[in-house]
Each structure stands twice: as structure tokens, then as C-alpha cells.
Amino acid sequence: MAKKDYYEILGVSKTAEEREIKKAYKRLAMKFHPDRNQEQDAEARFKEIKEAYEILTDAQKRAAYDQYGHAAFEQGGMGGGGGFGGGAEFSDIFGDVFGDIFGGGRRQRASRGSDLRYNMELSLEEAVRGVTKEIRIPTLEECGVCHGSGAKPGSSPVTCPTCHGQGQVQMRQGFFTVQQACPHCHGRGQIIKDPCNSCHGHGRVEKAKTLSVKIPAGVDTGDRIRLAGEGEAGEHGAPAGDLYVQVQVKAHPIFEREGNNLYCEVPINFAMAALGGEIEVPTLDGRVKLKVPAETQTGKLFRMRGKGVKSVRGGSQGDLLCRVVVETPVNLNDKQKQLLKELEESLGGPSGDKNSPRSKSFFDGVKKFFDDLTR
């Protein structure tokens, strides 16, 4: 596959000055550096950007690239390198130009520990009021014997004989010598000659640890709580990662939650719906009385202010909304059936206009619909 044009990679023109090239490089390197960008192709993009920068900020290499393209840096290109002598060494531009942003340098930094995730199920009551829970998680912790160094107590890591402590080695690439992470010490500049017997030189050991996690009042499904430094220990003394507790609130048999409001259905019999009355309804703080006005229809919402969930960020508290459901009586005895028939007759039948305005409106609409069809 053909290599992409270096100028296109950095988004600069072929006449761009070194100042413009450096500016473009810093912007793109910040965007695609693997420490900051977790996308799958970020590392490949970053290497591509770095390579383009290295060529275009070296006057000789840029001139060769402008004349011969990528062929100038392939083995055997330009007839053995006429005009470049025995080859020019790269300076470590990553450390010079980019080090101030990411704390870079010649040695590769030990890797920060991985972040961990823990899924925590809560009841609605726990989520609303807040709770402290103990959790147990498998993780990698700093070795207590060598304190993360990887070396046996009484010994120390030694300077890598391959890179002489630089963390990088020079490799031939076409006409030029480039610097890469040392394959022996993996860029650290040091090796463990006498490894710790407990962690076998890794500086970390597998353990299960118990943590006490305080869940604030008002959390909801999808909320995430970060415990800084409670992830896996870093390599060779590097900082630990973080632990993220992911909240999942279980379904409740009575209440449903929407934001900071709670909803519940309250069944009432049709006599109370017609005549009105008072009932007890549940809240998370206990029972409260609700006045039901006469002529209440199914679906009517009654709002009880301040009986919902307090915002996890502080401030106002949500409401409890009770949705009334008028229940049709079942298992009627003969007397009850007779009374209902008498009531129906007194109401003027199913479509009585005075006592059932919605029924009258519905049946009037049905009659008009069929009348229109027969015209």
C-alpha cells in the first residue's frame, strides 16, 4: 500500500515553514497520542505523524523527500545515498519537542496501572438515600516485598547493557539512523538481574482487596463513581489506575423513577372515584394521606411535592406522582349485581348524557360516523 504524503499527514503545504510544521505536529500529536486517545488506530496515526515531522523538520531529509518522495528513505534509494555521506543520525525529536507536553524523554516511562470497573446493583431505597457498601475486587497490587521495583531486596535494577541506560537504540532505516525503544529493557534503561522471588521481577502481585465504597444519595442507573488510585498498581512504581463503580438500580415493585421524580399507580374503587374520599399512599418516607376529589377519572395524576428523589448534585428534591386507576369490581354477589343494574338505569344506561359525558360524546361520535357512511 502506498505511503501517505508527509505534507498531507501534517495538513501543511509543501512551502510550509518549520514553525508551521512544528505547530501542526504538536496539535496532531496531542490529539492522537496513545496516552490520551484510546481509539484503535490512534497509535498508528501517532507514528505516522511523528515520522512525517522527523522528515520535514530536517533540511537534508526534506530536500531528499521533495525530490525523490518516499524512495529516498528506502534501502538502496538514490544510488547508495549520494550527497548524504555515510548517513545522518536522527536527534530524539520526540523528547525535544513533545517531552514538555507529556513529560517524555529518552527513557520510556513505566506504564500507569489499568483502570478497573465494578458493577454495583442497588435497591431504589439505597440509591435514593445513599449507602456505604463493601466490595471485593481482584486486582494487581504493588509487591510488598520489593515495593514495586521488581528486584530482590538488597539488590537494585542495573543499567541495560544494550542501550547503556538510554532506553533507546539506533536502527538503520534507509540512509538514516533512527532511534527506537530498546528491545532488551523495553525502553526503561534498566533491567532486573536478580528478580524478586515474590513477584518474579514484575513489581506487582495478584490480590483480592476489599474496599468500602460510599454511594451518595440520589444516584441513578448509569451513574459512575470514580475511586482515584484504587485500580491496578502501575509497573515498577508507576501510578495506580482508578476504580470506576458503575451503578445499576434494581426495579422496584411500587415505584418507577424518571429523573428525580417517582411515579406509582394507586387503585381506587369506582365508588370512591365518583364520590371522593381519602386513601393512604406509600412514599419512601412512609405512608401519607391523599385526598381524592369526587368525579376522579382513571389516569389522573396527583403530585406530592418533595416526596421524590433529592438530586445527587444537591439542590431541589423531586416529587411523587400518583396515577389513579379506577378498578372495576369483580366477584359480585347477586345483591351487588342488582344494585349496579339499578344504578345503571338511574344513570340513563351506558350512554347517559348527564352522568357520563365522555360516554355520551363517544356514542354520539359513533352514531355520526355510521350515519355518514350510509349517506
UniProtKB/Swiss-Prot annotation:
A zinc finger (CR-type) spans 130-208. InterPro entries: DnaJ, DnaJ_C, DnaJ_domain, DnaJ_domain_CS, HSP40/DnaJ_pept-bd, HSP_DnaJ_Cys-rich_dom, HSP_DnaJ_Cys-rich_dom_sf, J_dom_sf. GO terms for molecular function: ATP binding; heat shock protein binding; unfolded protein binding; zinc ion binding. Keywords: Chaperone, Cytoplasm, DNA replication, Metal-binding, Repeat, Stress response, Zinc, Zinc-finger. It is found in: Cytoplasm. One of its GO terms (biological process) is DNA replication. It comes from the Bacteria. Its cofactor is Zn(2+). This is Chaperone protein DnaJ.
